[in-house]
Amino acid sequence: MYHSVNVQVKQGTALFQWCDYNAHCANNLYNAALFRERQMMTSSKKTIHELTDNELEVMSEVENAKQWMTRPREVPPSGVMSYTFLNDVMRFNCNPDYYAEGFPIHCAQNILKQVTQDLNSFFKAVKKWNVAPWEFNGKPKLPEYKHKQGTTTFVSSNQECRIHQTKRGNYYCSLPKTKEIVHLGKSVPGKLIEVHISPMHGIYQISCVFDDEVETVQPSKKHERMVGVDPGVNTLLAVVNNCGMPNLLFNGRPLKSINQLYNKQIANIVSENT
């Protein structure tokens, strides 16, 4: 089961500057990757004479990347590139947002995964909308670009982040490409999986996700032992079962009386102050 330990980082600290810089890099990379995906999507529906300069530029990047791929790939008819394909395009063309100075490579790869996941979610939503449009408020829209000067959440893996313990028994998490650390206290709930860094109302929240490696108990698919619960007012709960155990009735009148007294006292206090 997964657990998270959250730490908030205020402005004016070196750790905040690290978070802010990388969140801007993540934002720029998301827009750059989405731009290439969208250009390939629109170009797949056009003839060579109808292509725009942006579409031609991106198609040139794709063709250049294909020359360096160990296993040749082709762009699907929809024009949507998979994560692996998109990663190769950004990598082999030495994209400046992908290789932004100080931006961890695993964080960059996770941003590309997020772009492809957002597009896959869009196509799934469109497919469902075509079948059951009444379940939506409107036709699903393509993922939008993020604010040009904005920030966005980025994720670092446990290959870049490490959990350490001091001589006093305190735990902390080291982060990639910085000497700053995240203090976690006297205990951690398991094995570190990944670290999420999210902008939040002028601060940053660092969420360390752990796996306690305890298997979640799956509910039984057999419905042999069942209980029915009917909540009410005078009868707070009526509980019946097919297990041969006594049925239960919980009297709700005492709680109802307490609630009425509470409401009366609140009304008296409000009337005295108005």
Label every PLM stretch briefly.
Residues 1-274:
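Nucleic-acid substrate recognition interfaces
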